[in-house]
Amino acid sequence: STFFDAVWEVHYNSSRTGIRLIGPKPEWARSDGGEAGMHPSNIHDNAYAIGTIDFTGDMPVILGPDGPSLGGFVCPATVIHADLWKLGQLKAGDKLRFIPVSIETASDIARSQEQTIHSLTHESTDYLALGVDAILKQSPIIKKVEASESTEQVVYRPSGDRYLLIEYGPLTLDIRLRFRVHALMLWLERNSLKGILELTPGIRSLQVHYDALALPLSELMAHLKTAESELENIDNLCLPSRTVHLP
């Protein structure tokens, strides 16, 4: 709530790589990042979405199209796809606020925007009338599958309305989890859905970039459920590899 209540100022050191923001220092729920680093903002590397608000230490940065696609910092929110154009209008000293919306609302806004572009007629959307308090009370986890004797824990988190982050296991470095991520990526490449745009693996995670207007989240989640049921036990996993001979 502190993040969404604050009025942020655009830092002078901003570009297409990222828009730095000046505002209140966050109160962290932990003292450090565990295995990932000394600062509480540190996590094991996972993929970033364009428009993600990335806390590099205590300063948030809105990652732009020329920003990193992978990194080791926490990201509490992501600018929705329909509002990405606004990032290009910001300049040093501008003030802004973030307003949380549901995935369904984000898709409605994107669909309305597409209709506006094609019909050249404008329909206004009142963000403040969309139930902000209700959104803040929702968990950022849309699905969690507990670990069993043959499977790892899986957590699904949206990153904005066009990206889905899939995380395996606990927050530890484990080559088994990396293998599981790679196996899922290979399965999705073999069984691709129309609307999946890009797959970006991390250490223990995989981010799926998809077109929400062509591929609803519910359909993507059903596809991922099928993937988990078809993937082999990680102990029996066999992945292609290669030998490189150096001169």
Model-derived regions, located:
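Glycine-rich active-site loops that engage anionic ligands at enzyme catalytic sites
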Residues: 1-247
